[in-house]
Amino acid sequence: MSCQQNQQQCQPPPKCPAKSPAQCLPPASSSCAPSSGGCGPSSERSCCLSHHRCRRSHRCRCQSSNSCDRGSGQQGGSSSCGHSSAGCC
């Protein structure tokens, strides 16, 4: 085995690219429409967005108390959160 092959095997795996907001969004679905606050059918009471939780009002709320990026203009406790440095809030 050549030195070049050894070096290739010893290289660390590539870092994962930063997630874009598009990657964080769920697939298009009528139950995830913005008008429903991103929530699923009322019978399921599930939230289509990760790190969110649907409440009785069927609006998704961020579980995390961390605020989102200032550029999004949304805070962590709002019903429509932006993209935080740690992923989707």
UniProtKB/Swiss-Prot annotation:
Complex and partners: Interacts with CYSRT1; the interaction is direct.
Family to which this protein belongs: Belongs to the LCE family.
Membrane-crossing segments per the record: none
Region (Disordered): 1-46, 62-89
This protein's record includes keyword Translocase: no
Coiled-coil blocks: none
Chain intervals with Low complexity compositional bias: 1-10, 17-46
Regulation: induction: Induced upon stimulation with inflammatory cytokines produced by T-helper 1 cells (IL1A, TNF, IFNG) and T-helper 17 cells (IL17A, IL22).
Alphabetic keyword roster: Antimicrobial, Keratinization
Database matches in Pfam families: LCE (PF14672)
Function: A structural component of the cornified envelope of the stratum corneum involved in innate cutaneous host defense. Possesses defensin-like antimicrobial activity against a broad spectrum of Gram-positive and Gram-negative bacteria, both aerobic and anaerobic species. Upon inflammation, may regulate skin barrier repair by shaping cutaneous microbiota composition and immune response to bacterial antigens.
Tissue spec. comment: Skin-specific. Expression was readily detected in adult trunk skin, adult arm skin, fetal skin, penal skin, vulva, esophagus and tongue. Not expressed in the cervix, rectum, lung, colon, or placenta.
Domain of life of the native organism: Eukaryota
Record GO biological process: defense response to Gram-negative bacterium; defense response to Gram-positive bacterium; keratinization; killing of cells of another organism
Keyword Methyltransferase attached: no
Protein's name in the database: Late cornified envelope protein 3A
InterPro entries, per the entry: LCE
